[in-house]
Regions:
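Non-catalytic, alpha-helical, charged scaffold/linker segments
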Residues: 93-228
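Metal-dependent nucleic-acid phosphoesterase active-site entry motif
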Residues: 2-43, 183-199, 251-252
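Long, positively charged, glycine-interspersed low-complexity recognition regions
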Residues: 1-10, 45, 58, 82, ...
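Conserved aromatic-histidine-acidic binding/catalytic patches
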Residues: 13-14, 39, 60, 73-76, ...
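Short His-Asn-centered micro-motif
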Residues: 23, 64-66, 75, 278-279, ...
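Glycine-rich nucleotide phosphate-binding loop and flanking beta-alpha elements
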Residues: 29, 70, 303-304
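Long, positively charged binding patches that form subdomain-scale interaction surfaces
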Residues: 198-281
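Extended charged low-complexity segments that act as oligomerization/scaffolding linkers
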Residues: 17-21, 33, 38, 46-74, ...
Length: 330
């Protein structure tokens, strides 16, 4: 190779895809404190500046999840909420992981297209990410929206995604904020109740049998999304009953969102403690980020559950608990 063709370290970094790094909410709180009071949090400030430089250089991306947005949105102290929202909107560049329905439908469609050797692919290789913050919950054109969002409003949000995220998280009427929080919490609590009831109902079963039961229940709970996935690839839903349901079993086994929820839920059920709403938020978070992140920095409990379930190896994601470890990893 001619010496003129040798890439510099900075050129080489730009030629490589940015690493996807997911931070759970407590890590974001640490960074926000380093923004507000750098002299009180010198080590976190060093890390903050390190991450800012990596984001600016295009070497990492720090997308948020619906749970991140919820946790920030629910803070009652306006100043604290603004500081955290500003930190997240700036470092994430308003990028979010898409919501449960879009992810599950697309993942299932990809699995079905491979199972049935059908010519179908998601056109956008970066489909799982969006810079419309609301798409962490549902698509902007989702027919389930009670009030459709006017196109000129969406255009403004697309033009100024960080400001749109900041305005949503830190501003707006308090009654609307509280209503959104209650709706999110209700969904998490419904999942918690289901898992607790299933744990009691199948207490004497082996883990293998509980895995089979949970697989069936997942398909039943998500069948409208799975039918939509079959429609996307042009596959009649009835075909999934072929070979005594082997396709349905493969669907649960190969669809990341379903697999992760099943495996972590089984680990949760096996613990000798009550299951809390916070567990459901973490469960949804891990189901969202594990298939698409290069590094996940989260709390000990769910990191350990994911490791025990072999999910880090399954998806090739680094599972970390110490925010400062990123300096040596990245």
């Amino acid at each position: 190779m001619d010496s003129a063709e040798v890439l510099s370290p900075s050129d080489l970094a730009l030629a490589q895809p940015a690493k996807i790094v997911y931070l759970d909410q407590n890590k974001w709180i640490d960074l926000a404190r380093a923004v507000a009071a750098p002299e009180d949090h010198p080590e976190d400030r060093i890390l903050l500046e390190f991450l800012c430089a990596k984001v600016e250089a295009g070497q990492i991306r720090l997308p948020l999840t619906a749970s991140n947005l919820y946790e920030t949105h629910k803070l009652n102290d306006p100043e604290q909420r603004f500081n955290l929202a500003h930190t997240q909107a700036t470092l994430s560049r308003a990028e979010v992981f898409r919501g449960h329905r879009r992810r599950l439908e697309t993942e299932a469609a990809l699995v079905l297209s491979k199972l049935y050797k059908m010519e179908w692919a998601e056109q956008d290789p970066d489909w799982v990410f969006s810079t419309l913050f609301l798409e962490a919950h549902m698509e902007a054109d989702d027919p389930r929206l009670e009030t459709p969002i006017p196109e000129h409003v969406l255009a403004l949000m697309r033009a100024y995604p960080q400001q749109a995220m900041l305005d949503h998280l830190a501003g707006g009427p308090d009654d609307i904020r509280r209503a959104a929080i209650s709706k999110f919490e209700a969904g998490c609590d419904a999942l918690r109740v289901d898992i607790e009831a299933r744990r009691i109902r199948h207490e004497g079963e082996s883990e293998s049998m509980r895995r089979k039961i949970y697989s069936v229940l997942l398909v039943l709970d998500q069948q409208d999304i799975l039918i939509a996935a079959a429609d996307r690839v042009g596959l009649p839903w009835e075909r999934l009953k072929d070979n005594n349901g082997s396709a349905i079993r493969a669907l649960v086994r190969e669809t990341p969102t379903l697999l992760i929820e099943r495996e972590i839920a089984l680990k949760l059920e096996a613990q000798a403690r009550p299951i809390h709403v916070n567990d459901m938020r973490d469960l949804r978070n891990f189901s969202t980020v594990l298939p698409y992140a290069d590094i996940v920095v989260a709390e000990n409990q769910f990191t350990n559950l994911a490791r025990q379930a072999g999910l880090g190896d399954r998806f090739g994601v680094g599972l970390e608990t110490d925010l400062r470890s990123l300096i040596s990893i990245l």
